[in-house]
């Protein structure tokens, strides 16, 4: 039944655009160049406005998710990486529930990846239609069918570009993956902007700068009471403050510290005597995958809730899913959940909000920890990183665990890998919650993603440098 499903969609996968694997080893400097080109294309798409939209100034329903999903309001990157991540989430859940089975052969894995890409394109079209028909760019009846279709086509083509850019890096032409690169860029851009933004905001206390550091100097220069000015710079509401910035740096340091936690399993060569090595099992065994999938789940729930709330406002079941309110305080107009399931699955705005509504905080903590642990545990089964897959890789390299035969390696690895995956996912969720409660810039999830992705690129750079021998030879 499961394999039949993949076989059914095989003809459709064959007609999808695909990046061919490189026929030769790509040098590091070429990888850096392709990564830079990929990032440049993404950033250009983030600045090109959608043609035909009447307005994008209304309250943004996905403001809270845009940093994580690398999307930009009213541009070609409106959908960001959401379709790719959502298709991965769906395929993972189907594989985890054994509705479809992914074999160990490269053919089955390639078919699974093709199915994921196909679903990504279908989801892109679906999300584009929902965005247009719910009036995000103006009343569809006023815009007309032709303009609506044009906007949908633009979003689809942009989504296809993101899919291909991600595949370009994944196939080995660049460094890391497109998803990781786009997320990290978007989050780092947000942090720098919130710290140094020269944009002025008219508050009840007078005109203030949005950037926390610029606001500090501005307040000290314009206020006669310097102590009060410092207090405002550190604790002002609805705008980035210095405590948010300090919390962000603190979370960066904590996550980097946890990146070093691992268990080294001793292994030896089955062919050569005296050749010993270690196989590291990191605390963050599945890296940032759990938090990416959790973000995709929540963002799609937001989309559904917003769509239903627009069409069926006041309906009891719709309100049970989520009720929304618009605000423009401290930045662009945005919609945020004030009730229903969406409210309880969204992070509290500050530590003060935790004290005001502890039930909200408890439900959010349980959801974050549980979902991250679940996604981490199920991801290892479909990504080729389970105990059985690792044992197979070691066997192919003619390596065995010291003190164990080949037949008992899977059993021994099963003692560590599923535990590391589940506990690592739990820690990822816990760190994200901590960052949210501390008020870190870019949300706890965003900070966590940025740090893990930057650390991955650091590891890639170190690995390439060790192979080449020097930094000069690496780049020039």
UniProtKB/Swiss-Prot annotation:
Q: How does it sit in the membrane?
A: Multi-pass membrane protein
Question: Its Gene Ontology biological processes?
Answer: cotranslational protein targeting to membrane; habenula development; post-translational protein targeting to membrane, translocation; pronephric nephron development; protein insertion into ER membrane; SRP-dependent cotranslational protein targeting to membrane, translocation
Q: Which Pfam families match?
A: Plug_translocon, SecY
According to the lineage, what is the superkingdom? Eukaryota
Q: Name one GO cellular component term.
A: Sec61 translocon complex
**Stretches that traverse the bilayer:** 34-53, 77-96, 118-138, 145-165, 173-193, 241-261, 289-309, 355-375, 421-441, 446-462
UniProtKB keywords: Developmental protein, Endoplasmic reticulum, Membrane, Protein transport, Translocation, Transmembrane, Transmembrane helix, Transport
Q: A GO molecular function for this record?
A: protein transmembrane transporter activity
**Localization per record:** Endoplasmic reticulum membrane
Lumenal topological domain residue ranges? 54-76, 139-144, 194-240, 310-354, 442-445
Q: Please indicate the ranges of residues that lie on the Cytoplasmic side.
A: 2-33, 97-117, 166-172, 262-288, 376-420, 463-476
Please describe the quaternary structure of this protein: The SEC61 channel-forming translocon complex consists of channel-forming core components SEC61A1, SEC61B and SEC61G and different auxiliary components such as SEC62 and SEC63. The SEC61 channel associates with the multi-pass translocon (MPT) complex.
What is its biological role? Component of SEC61 channel-forming translocon complex that mediates transport of signal peptide-containing precursor polypeptides across the endoplasmic reticulum (ER). Forms a ribosome receptor and a gated pore in the ER membrane, both functions required for cotranslational translocation of nascent polypeptides. May cooperate with auxiliary protein SEC62, SEC63 and HSPA5/BiP to enable post-translational transport of small presecretory proteins.
Protein family: Belongs to the SecY/SEC61-alpha family.
Official protein name in the record: Protein transport protein Sec61 subunit alpha-like 1
Give the organism, scientific name.
Danio rerio
Q: Which gene encodes it?
A: sec61al1
């Amino acid at each position: 039944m499961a394999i039949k499903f993949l076989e059914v969609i095989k003809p459709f996968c064959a007609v999808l655009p695909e990046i061919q694997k490189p026929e030769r080893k790509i040098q590091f400097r070429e990888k850096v160049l392709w990564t830079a080109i990929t990032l440049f294309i993404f950033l250009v798409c983030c600045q090109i406005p959608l043609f035909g939209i009447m307005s994008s100034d209304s309250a943004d329903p996905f403001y809270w998710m845009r940093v994580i999903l690398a999307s930009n309001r009213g541009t070609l990157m409106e959908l960001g990486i959401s379709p790719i991540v959502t298709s991965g989430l769906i395929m993972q859940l189907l594989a985890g529930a054994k509705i479809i089975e992914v074999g160990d052969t490269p053919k089955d894995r390639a078919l699974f990846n093709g199915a994921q890409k196909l679903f990504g394109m279908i989801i892109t079209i679906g999300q584009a239609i929902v965005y247009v028909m719910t009036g995000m760019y103006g009343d569809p009846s006023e815009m007309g069918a032709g303009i609506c279709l044009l906007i949908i086509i633009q979003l689809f083509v942009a989504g296809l570009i993101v899919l291909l850019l991600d595949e370009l890096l994944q196939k080995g032409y660049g460094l890391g993956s497109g998803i990781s690169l786009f997320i990290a860029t978007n989050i780092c851009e947000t942090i720098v902007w919130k710290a140094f933004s020269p944009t002025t905001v008219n508050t009840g206390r007078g005109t203030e700068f949005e950037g926390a550091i610029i606001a500090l100097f501005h307040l000290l220069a314009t206020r006669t009471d310097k102590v009060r000015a410092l207090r405002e710079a550190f604790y002002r509401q609805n705008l980035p403050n210095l405590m948010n910035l300090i919390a962000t740096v603190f979370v960066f340091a904590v996550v980097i510290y946890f990146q070093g936690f691992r268990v080294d399993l001793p292994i030896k060569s089955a062919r050569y005597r005296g050749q010993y090595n270690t196989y590291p099992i990191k605390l963050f065994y599945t890296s940032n995958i759990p938090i990416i999938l959790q973000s995709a789940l929540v963002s799609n729930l937001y989309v559904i809730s917003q769509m239903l709330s627009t069409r069926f406002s006041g309906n009891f079941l719709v309100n049970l899913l989520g009720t929304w309110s618009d605000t423009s305080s401290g930045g662009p107009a945005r919609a945020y959940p004030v009730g229903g399931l969406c409210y309880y699955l969204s992070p509290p705005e500050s530590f003060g909000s935790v004290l005001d509504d502890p039930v909200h905080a408890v439900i959010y903590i349980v959801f974050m920890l549980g979902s991250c642990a679940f996604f981490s545990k199920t991801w290892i089964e479909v990504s080729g990183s389970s105990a059985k897959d690792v044992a197979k890789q070691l066997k192919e390299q003619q390596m065995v665990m010291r003190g164990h035969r080949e037949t008992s390696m899977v059993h021994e690895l099963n003692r560590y890998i599923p535990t590391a995956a589940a506990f690592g996912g739990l820690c990822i969720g816990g760190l994200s919650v901590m960052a949210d409660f501390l008020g870190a810039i870019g949300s706890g999830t965003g900070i966590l993603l940025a740090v893990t992705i930057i650390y991955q690129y650091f590891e890639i750079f170190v690995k390439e440098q060790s192979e080449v021998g020097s930094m000069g030879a690496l780049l020039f």
